[in-house]
């Protein structure tokens, strides 16, 4: 069956809801504070990502649709950082600034892949005059094909019923990702998208699919909804509409790595697809495919048109894995258009061991995409001697490409990947070992382009050389 993606470029979607900024501080921990029994984290990496309703808008923009975002912020650095991050990925922001409140910010401190603490900077926006939000919605209704209301119970949607009525009068579908158990406030919405836990918190525990349908249809009638989509994790999702046969879609996820933000992806793809002129059933089909992609990524993520197309055509591996240099350049260009941060590293990776896997996982966390450049067999032989490599290039690249942390694998013939790096110009160049940043091949080119260069430590006790020596000793023994 030939599947054609929706014409996302002609879709206009407004997202209104609770916007927030997610901050991440990363660093090693090697001692306990003398002031209190707590670890000391030496912060070496800081990341800022749009969260809440802002992540929904990013998901819409990543598809190539026209995304507008309305929400409440303070007048502070967090609001400015949020606006800049969203502008970089083509989300049009029209925030209402509230000088008496801070922008909702969640700061997470992480070390050795563990979150040590989360600090929330927020004051609920309940009681803030909703009229400026209503005015922004009214101004946009003639130019959008869908309105998303993203509720995190922080106060931006205190007047959600008025917002629903504004859109209904204009004939614009309203999609809501609900929060809490008071679904009365969402009366008259086009579509609610609760997950199974949220759904059962309202209707009670459902032991069978039939119970989900029965109670879901009653919910639709009670609150005058047009449809209900219950997302059910590994069991897929169920679309319920009055007078129509329930549509149960199995999950398309090959491997679940992280469900963070999956709900944002689902409602974002639903809205963009509906706004492009497709049916609700088609929108659910694409949203289900997108969810299968995004849960295979670490952290809050978005889905690109290429990834979505590959997923719906059953070719989730196309566009990723082992690539030629020219294919890689095209993939990187597409990633940059989506506002993704590209990380690059290189090495021989002859006998893949735990140290390699840990190193690559840590490198991947520093960005959105990870490129691994691999020395060819001839290059490896010149660097390591006639007995190397143990594993030929093709096998080394296939194994690397199968790792969850690795997006793209490419080879190079030279002793160093300097020429390759100069052609790719990653946002962040990473190398493991005892190098100084200025000693790393390609560092000058990356710096000249405004990028960063970082040295990561390898896991102690892990090396290909030691593994080979042990094998040789075991043979002699």
From Swiss-Prot:
Its EC number is 2.7.1.167, 2.7.7.70. InterPro entries: Bifunc_HldE, Carboh/pur_kinase_PfkB_CS, Cyt_trans-like, PfkB_dom, RfaE_dom_I, RfaE_dom_II, Ribokinase-like, Rossmann-like_a/b/a_fold. GO terms for molecular function: ATP binding; heptose 7-phosphate kinase activity; heptose-1-phosphate adenylyltransferase activity; phosphotransferase activity, alcohol group as acceptor. The keyword Signal does not apply. Residues 1-318 are annotated as: Ribokinase. Pathway: Nucleotide-sugar biosynthesis; ADP-L-glycero-beta-D-manno-heptose biosynthesis; ADP-L-glycero-beta-D-manno-heptose from D-glycero-beta-D-manno-heptose 7-phosphate: step 1/4; Nucleotide-sugar biosynthesis; ADP-L-glycero-beta-D-manno-heptose biosynthesis; ADP-L-glycero-beta-D-manno-heptose from D-glycero-beta-D-manno-heptose 7-phosphate: step 3/4. Residues 344-477 are annotated as: Cytidylyltransferase. PROSITE patterns: PFKB_KINASES_1. It is an enzyme of class 2 (transferase). Keywords: Acetylation, ATP-binding, Carbohydrate metabolism, Kinase, Multifunctional enzyme, Nucleotide-binding, Nucleotidyltransferase, Transferase. ATP binds at residues 195-198. The keyword Transport does not apply. Transmembrane segments: none annotated. The active site is at 264. GO terms for cellular component: cytosol. It holds the Pfam family PfkB. The modification N6-acetyllysine is found at residue 179. One of its GO terms (biological process) is ADP-L-glycero-beta-D-manno-heptose biosynthetic process. Catalyzes the ADP transfer from ATP to D-glycero-beta-D-manno-heptose 1-phosphate, yielding ADP-D-glycero-beta-D-manno-heptose. PANTHER family: BIFUNCTIONAL PROTEIN HLDE (PTHR46969:SF1). In the N-terminal section; belongs to the carbohydrate kinase PfkB family. Homodimer. This is Bifunctional protein HldE. The gene is hldE.
């Amino acid at each position: 069956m030939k599947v054609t993606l929706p014409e996302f470029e002609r879709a206009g979607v407004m997202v209104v809801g609770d916007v927030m900024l997610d901050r991440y501080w990363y660093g090693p921990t090697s001692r306990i504070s003398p002031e209190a029994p707590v670890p000391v984290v030496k912060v070496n990496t800081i990341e800022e990502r749009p969260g809440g309703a802002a992540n929904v808008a990013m998901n819409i923009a990543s598809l190539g649709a026209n995304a507008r975002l309305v929400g409440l912020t303070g007048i502070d650095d967090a609001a400015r950082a949020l606006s800049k991050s969203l502008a970089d990925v083509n989300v049009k922001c029209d925030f209402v600034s509230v000088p008496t409140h801070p922008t909702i910010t969640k700061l997470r401190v992480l070390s050795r892949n563990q979150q040590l603490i989360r600090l929330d900077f927020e004051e609920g926006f309940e009681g803030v005059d909703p009229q400026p939000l209503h005015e922004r919605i009214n101004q946009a209704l003639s130019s959008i094909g869908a309105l998303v209301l993203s509720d995190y119970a922080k106060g931006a949607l205190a007047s959600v019923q008025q917002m629903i009525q504004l859109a209904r009068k204009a004939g614009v579908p309203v999609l809501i990702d609900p929060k809490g158990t008071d679904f009365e406030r969402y009366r008259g919405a086009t579509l609610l998208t609760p997950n199974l836990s949220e759904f059962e918190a309202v209707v009670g525990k459902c032991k069978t699919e039939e119970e989900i349908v029965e109670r879901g249809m009653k919910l639709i009638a009670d609150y005058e909804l047009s449809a209900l989509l219950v997302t059910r994790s590994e069991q897929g999702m169920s679309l319920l509409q009055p007078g129509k046969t329930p549509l149960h879609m199995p999950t398309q996820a090959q491997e679940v790595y992280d469900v963070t933000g999956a709900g944002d992806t689902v409602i974002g793809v639903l809205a963009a697809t509906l706004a492009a002129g497709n049916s609700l059933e088609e929108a659910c089909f694409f949203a289900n495919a997108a969810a299968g992609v995004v849960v295979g990524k670490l952290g809050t993520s978005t889905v690109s048109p290429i990834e979505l197309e590959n997923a719906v055509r059953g070719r989730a591996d196309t566009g990723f894995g082992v690539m030629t240099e020219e294919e890689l350049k095209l993939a990187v260009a597409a990633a940059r258009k989506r506002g993704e941060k590209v990380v690059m590293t290189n090495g021989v990776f002859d006998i893949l061991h735990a140290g390699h896997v840990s190193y690559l996982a840590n490198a991947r966390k520093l960005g959105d995409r990870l490129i691994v450049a691999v020395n060819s067999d001839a290059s490896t032989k010149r660097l390591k001697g006639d007995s190397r490599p143990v594993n030929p290039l093709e096998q080394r690249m296939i194994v690397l490409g199968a790792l969850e942390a690795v997006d793209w694998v490419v080879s190079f013939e030279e002793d160093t990947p300097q020429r390759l790096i100069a052609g790719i110009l990653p946002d962040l160049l990473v190398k493991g070992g005892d190098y100084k940043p200025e000693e790393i091949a390609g560092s000058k080119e990356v710096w000249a382009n405004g990028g960063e260069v970082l040295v990561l430590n390898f896991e102690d006790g892990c090396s290909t050389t030691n593994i080979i020596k042990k094998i040789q000793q075991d043979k002699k023994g």
